[in-house]
Amino acid sequence: MDATTTAKRKRPAASDIADDAPTTVDEVSDAEVEEFYAILRRMRDATRRLGARPPPPRAPAWRPSFSWEDFADAPPKQAPPPPQQPADHERVAENATPPRRPAPGLDLNVEPPSDAPATPRSARAPA
């Protein structure tokens, strides 16, 4: 390859790109900053509350105990009674979809319960 093709492939310098791009600074209100830190506090409180639980105790190992009666032949079962036809309103209820319940999980828009210890805020000078 000659020098002209390699010169075309070079990337422009970073300083050239920075001069062309306009720089914008978004002004953020104190309320937005407080809301952001409130969300962070709720996340930290939730992880401490949900993640700090000790593991549940293990169930003891199952140790079956058998007796000779367990292996005896079972008496013959009686035939079940014929099924009854449900009423029309029961059929509708049977085919209806159950109401949706919200999935349990972490909702950062909900304030933590009042019985949980509050996370102390750091004391910082007002701006």
Curated annotation (Swiss-Prot):
Sequence ranges of Low complexity compositional bias: 112-127
CC terms in the record's Gene Ontology section: nucleus
Major site of localization recorded for this protein: nucleus
A biological process from GO: regulation of systemic acquired resistance
Chain segments carrying region Disordered: 1-28, 47-127
Keywords: Nucleus, Plant defense
Record localization: Nucleus
Described function: Acts as a negative regulator of disease resistance. Acts on basal resistance, age-related resistance and resistance mediated by the LRR receptor kinase XA21. Plants over-expressing NRR display enhanced susceptibility to the bacterial blight Xanthomonas oryzae pv. oryzae (Xoo). Binds to and represses NPR1/NH1-mediated transcriptional activation of LG2 in vitro.
Family according to the record: Belongs to the NPR1-interactor family.
Subunit comment: Interacts with NPR1/NH1. Interacts with NPR3/NH3.
Name assigned to this protein: Protein NEGATIVE REGULATOR OF RESISTANCE
Organism: Oryza sativa subsp. japonica (Rice)
Gene name tied to this protein: NRR
